[in-house]
Amino acid sequence: MISKEKKQEIINAYGRNANDTGSPEVQIALLTERIAELTEHLKINKKDHHSRRGLLKMVGQRKGLLEYLKKTNLEGYRELIARLGLRK
């Protein structure tokens, strides 16, 4: 679970303003953070298949948002994956 402070930091870093929670850049950054936390959880709890299913759902959601961003704003897409350290 992402704390309020961490979530606000991500929104400030990737959003267009402090209240921008809906832009694809912010959504992708938040999903990336949640995926990283859940990945760490699953390294410890290998048999937690319910969380694994949620992780796969989040990865798919992020993939769809990345495809949308690539289609609508190619330069923003390239910048975002470089900042987040995603491979594409």
From Swiss-Prot:
One cellular-component annotation, GO: cytosolic small ribosomal subunit
Keyword RNA-binding: yes
GO biological process terms on file: translation
Xref: InterPro entries: Ribosomal_uS15, Ribosomal_uS15_bac-type, uS15_NS1_RNA-bd_sf
Classification via Gene3D superfamilies: 6.10.250.3130, S15/NS1, RNA-binding
Disulfide bonds: none
Keywords, alphabetical: Ribonucleoprotein, Ribosomal protein, RNA-binding, rRNA-binding
GO MF annotation list: rRNA binding; structural constituent of ribosome
Keyword Ribonucleoprotein assigned: yes
Pfam families per the UniProt record, alphabetical: Ribosomal_S15
PROSITE patterns assigned to the protein according to its UniProt record, in alphabetical order: RIBOSOMAL_S15
Subunit structure: Part of the 30S ribosomal subunit. Forms a bridge to the 50S subunit in the 70S ribosome, contacting the 23S rRNA.
PANTHER family to which the protein is assigned, alphabetical: RIBOSOMAL PROTEIN S15, BACTERIAL AND ORGANELLAR, SMALL RIBOSOMAL SUBUNIT PROTEIN US15M
Family: Belongs to the universal ribosomal protein uS15 family.
Role: One of the primary rRNA binding proteins, it binds directly to 16S rRNA where it helps nucleate assembly of the platform of the 30S subunit by binding and bridging several RNA helices of the 16S rRNA.
Protein known as: Small ribosomal subunit protein uS15
Taxonomic lineage: Bacteria, Bacillati, Bacillota, Clostridia, Lachnospirales
Gene label: rpsO
